[in-house]
Every structure is written in structure tokens, then in C-alpha cells.
């Protein structure tokens, strides 16, 4: 039998044997018997050494074609085995396409973020723009341009976090007022929500890291009446009811006159608790008319332009909204607390 005949016979034998494989592992083992380094086709091709050059070309081509044909046969058989395996698996297993997926843990916005976005929506509906500013500020923007004197106690290192280069962590979002006055042309209305830092003793109603929403309106003939109306509108929309408030004198260097707008404590309904320090009232909104010195420092004519400003304690507002007794929960990272919102 010539080598060509042996190759043809080997291909027929291989196809018969490979067809009998019932698994991919068995198929690979049988493939090695015929096409491996020590397989039957390799053994047959050892006879090429005794052939002439022309015969070698002919038989070599036939051998390559035989190898290609068998490899294609193996892959076709492999596809059949895979399809058969999957069909068997589907026959054994049931799959309910209507069954709900396993419940997955979902995240949510922090309660402070939720109320911040709600407040932004309220103010933008009233014609305000939302501004932002850096948390690391210059002493000038945080104090100087806001009419704080050089010896003001707020500038003391016991009240403010200073950086090594002389800057500081902003103690109030009022610093954004300065940027707004320099950047915008009056009349304008802006709010500026953000995180602030103070070197304070932490307790149920005080934190060293907390959030404020600064607000400022600059225009002509702005009065205290505009300020009170804006604040009461905000509070009634946030709490979805009329809120009892009181306005009392307060001193802040960047406003004149200055006020403290307090709300009746919603945690204890005014009876007195640790949040309101047994007073029944909670300090929520330091506010007032923008001090002429602040306007002049920004290059505005204080005889033409007036305005009001306020600094809303966002953490305390959230505490009132949800009846939370301790401000420290907000920074705790306690998921049991946060998942309630």
C-alpha cells in the first residue's frame, strides 16, 4: 500500500473513531491519537524519507490536506458535543423567567445632600443662582473682606483651622459672598451650599465639620422685609407647614443690622431638649442686611446698592425635618442610621 493510500485509509479510520466520542475530553484524547506528535499521521509521514522529490511534494500536499480535514472534523464534532451538553443541562434544570431577581443592596443620598438639593430647587424657583467655592480659603476672603477686624476672636487659632501656608479651612460659606460680589454685577440673587469647618467642641448640636447654605441678594431698595419673607417662604416649603419663628438682634461683622432667626424646636415641639439646650428654640439662620463696608470692599456703591445675606445651618435644618436628636450621626458613617433615608 502506497503512502497516499495509507493517508486516505487513516482519514477514514480517524473519522469513524472521532465520531464515537461522547465528551470533549474523549474527543481531545482521540485527536491526539491521530494528529499528536506521536500520532498515527506522524508515523505514516515518516515514510516520506524513502520517496523521490516529486513524490514527496505530492504526498506532502496530501498529508497537509488530510490534517486540515481531520482538524475541521474535530471542531465540527466539538460543536455538536457542546450543543448536546447544553441541551441536556437545560433539560435537567428549570429556569423561571418571571422569577424576581435577588434583592440587591442599593445606595442612597445622604440626608444632608437630599435636603440641600431640595433647598436648591426652592431657591432656583425663586430666581436664585447656585454658586460654589473652595473649602480652603484665604484669610482675606473668609474674614477681611467680610469686615472682620484683625483682632476678631473668630480669627484665633482656637476657633479656626489654619494651613501651614497661611490659608484656612473656611469657617462659613459667607466667603462665597465675597467671590459673588467680585464676579457678578448687581442686581443678583445667589445661594452657596457647602461644607465648613470650625475648631469646636463636639456635642449633640455642635460639630467641627458641618454644612451651610449661604444666601445673598443685592439690588436696589432691598429691606429687612424682603429678608424675612424669603426666609419664611423657605422654611414653610422645606417643612411643608408654617413654622413658628422669632427674630432677635445679632452681631455679625458682614451685616448691619444683624439678626438671629430662630425656629421653634421641632424635635421637642418647644418643650426643651438637648438639641435646643432646653430653650425650646433653635438658632438656625444668622442673617441681616449686607454691611456697606462689604459692598464697598467689592467696589460697589453702598448708597445705590443694598442687599441681605443669610447663613442657613443645613445640618440643624435636617435635624428639625426628621426629628434627629444628635448632629454627630451625620458624620458617623453609621449605615443603620443612613439607610432610614
Curated annotation (Swiss-Prot):
<dbReference type="Pfam" id="PF02912">
    <property type="entry name" value="Phe_tRNA-synt_N"/>
</dbReference>
<keyword id="KW-0648">Protein biosynthesis</keyword>
<dbReference type="InterPro" id="IPR004188">
    <property type="entry name" value="Phe-tRNA_ligase_II_N"/>
</dbReference>
<comment type="similarity">
    <text>Belongs to the class-II aminoacyl-tRNA synthetase family. Phe-tRNA synthetase alpha subunit type 1 subfamily.</text>
</comment>
<dbReference type="InterPro" id="IPR002319">
    <property type="entry name" value="Phenylalanyl-tRNA_Synthase"/>
</dbReference>
<dbReference type="InterPro" id="IPR010978">
    <property type="entry name" value="tRNA-bd_arm"/>
</dbReference>
<keyword id="KW-0963">Cytoplasm</keyword>
<dbReference type="GO" id="GO:0005524">
    <property type="term" value="F:ATP binding"/>
</dbReference>
<dbReference type="Pfam" id="PF01409">
    <property type="entry name" value="tRNA-synt_2d"/>
</dbReference>
<dbReference type="GO" id="GO:0004826">
    <property type="term" value="F:phenylalanine-tRNA ligase activity"/>
</dbReference>
<dbReference type="InterPro" id="IPR045864">
    <property type="entry name" value="aa-tRNA-synth_II/BPL/LPL"/>
</dbReference>
<keyword id="KW-0067">ATP-binding</keyword>
<protein>
    <recommendedName>
        <fullName>Phenylalanine--tRNA ligase alpha subunit</fullName>
        <ecNumber>6.1.1.20</ecNumber>
    </recommendedName>
</protein>
<dbReference type="GO" id="GO:0006432">
    <property type="term" value="P:phenylalanyl-tRNA aminoacylation"/>
</dbReference>
<dbReference type="InterPro" id="IPR006195">
    <property type="entry name" value="aa-tRNA-synth_II"/>
</dbReference>
<feature type="binding site">
    <location>
        <position position="256"/>
    </location>
    <ligand>
        <name>Mg(2+)</name>
    </ligand>
</feature>
<keyword id="KW-0547">Nucleotide-binding</keyword>
<keyword id="KW-0479">Metal-binding</keyword>
<dbReference type="GO" id="GO:0000287">
    <property type="term" value="F:magnesium ion binding"/>
</dbReference>
<dbReference type="GO" id="GO:0005737">
    <property type="term" value="C:cytoplasm"/>
</dbReference>
<keyword id="KW-0460">Magnesium</keyword>
<dbReference type="GO" id="GO:0000049">
    <property type="term" value="F:tRNA binding"/>
</dbReference>
<dbReference type="InterPro" id="IPR022911">
    <property type="entry name" value="Phe_tRNA_ligase_alpha1_bac"/>
</dbReference>
<dbReference type="InterPro" id="IPR004529">
    <property type="entry name" value="Phe-tRNA-synth_IIc_asu"/>
</dbReference>
<comment type="subunit">
    <text>Tetramer of two alpha and two beta subunits.</text>
</comment>
<keyword id="KW-0030">Aminoacyl-tRNA synthetase</keyword>
<keyword id="KW-0436">Ligase</keyword>
